[in-house]
Amino acid sequence: MDAMQKTIEYTSVSRIAGPLMVIDGIEGIAYGEIVDITTPNGDKRTGQVLEAREEIAVVQVFEGTSELNTSETKVRFTGDTAKIGVSHDMLGRIFNGAGKPLDGGPEIIAEKKLDINGYPLNPVSRNPPNAFVQTGVSTIDGTNTLVRGQKIPIFSGSGLPHNKLATQIARQAKVRGEGEQFAVVFAAMGITGEESNYFMDEFKKTGALEKAVVFINLADDPAIERILTPRIALTTAEYLAYEKGMHVLVILTDLTNYCEALREIAAARNEVPGRRGYPGYMYTDLACLYERAGRVKGKEGTVTQIPILTMPDDDITHPIPDLTGYITEGQIVLSRELNRKGIYPPVDILPSLSRLAGNGQGEGKTRDDHSKVISQAYAAYAEGRGLRDLVAVVGEEALTERDRSFLKFADAFENSIVTQGVDEDRSIEETLDYIWGLLTILPREELKRVSDELIEKYLPKK
């Protein structure tokens, strides 16, 4: 768009429908372009071009279309895409979903202005994710190890304590190694005022805000802002990682609310719906978010992602978790059954998986026994869980002594490894030592997945 076109104000609004506005007689307009809108009473609003074709532009108005009409509304196309001013001073601050300060502090003086859609990374320029990120949560660090540059979602359900777990991870997460800089970028989308107050209070009172940048989009904020929020958060993370050399953990919650906003906007545009009414491009859209995690050759910093989503009706085959699973590198599944038992965090390790766990385990990263002892504990816990079904039919008296030991191990594993205080920050060494202690419940001859050398080195003597 040339300079002349940037000064033209259009009054050719032909239709307003929900958050969308259609402008006729437009030339040289690009998809994603930012639009300045003047309401009939002189107020200023901002929008973004969602569709441009045959001299028609469809614009999503960020602040909604109330008080706008087709005769007096003025529109100016800026020629710019959505950008955010970023700075190292964003650490310790809380912003709304559009990147405006929410904590009463001053506006950020930008060191750079970056396109919120990021820049495509040549796959050849990527380094494989590696090195351990410690969350202080045993069921993540031990069995589903998080690796720098990885993207691993948490699959939750309505009413499960994913918000509590998210703030615990944000508070406790760290990278090991002298001189390594670490930060958390936390973005909440479509949350209630009560949830917003919980997040802000937790970050402030625990001191976690010092190393964090927080973005909060409320349920009553415009749907388009919900689409922008994760992109703004990821752009901030990329700046801290690739410009400032920091290792950044990005926590995005709740991606289900994000996808509902996608569906709302698609319906307003009369698009042909895909599975369960979600737009057909939802897979591509989610990939554009998740694939912004990683390590880049020549850059010290990394971006690691933990997106959190609530599965409608606890259905893991729902399009949102289903498509997410195709893109990401595993999943951490919260269990309603464990939650009913009073276990926190209710992480079910059997359906959970970190596909890159091996990249962050072992000597020099965690400990030499990590992968072997976890394999042994996982197998024993799975067998113990299976025996519970048998006990429900035949009773515990029908079990052999061997089977009883596995049943006892499963109960102990849930009560001492899975169960953890909300303020309990365990090192990986503590987690592994706890597991070795539990393995003493099993007969020595059943420890088939760990070597005699490791048993002699780490297994406590009875």
UniProtKB/Swiss-Prot annotation:
User: In its UniProt record, which GO terms are filed under biological process?
Assistant: proton motive force-driven plasma membrane ATP synthesis
Name the GO cellular-component terms. Answer: plasma membrane
Claim: Nucleotide-binding is one of the keywords in the record: no
One GO molecular-function annotation for this sequence? Answer: proton-transporting ATP synthase activity, rotational mechanism
Q: Topologically, how does it sit relative to the membrane?
A: Peripheral membrane protein
Keyword annotations:
ATP synthesis, Cell membrane, Hydrogen ion transport, Ion transport, Membrane, Transport
Transmembrane domains' residue ranges: none
Specify the domain of life of the species encoding this protein: Archaea
Subcellular locations according to the entry? Cell membrane
Its annotated function is as follows: Component of the A-type ATP synthase that produces ATP from ADP in the presence of a proton gradient across the membrane. The B chain is a regulatory subunit.
Record-stated family: Belongs to the ATPase alpha/beta chains family.
The protein's assembly and partners:
Has multiple subunits with at least A(3), B(3), C, D, E, F, H, I and proteolipid K(x).
In terms of HAMAP family, this protein maps to:
ATP_synth_B_arch (MF_00310)
**What is the protein name given in its UniProt record?**
A-type ATP synthase subunit B
Lineage from the top down? Archaea, Methanobacteriati, Methanobacteriota, Methanomada group, Methanococci
What gene does this protein come from? Answer: atpB
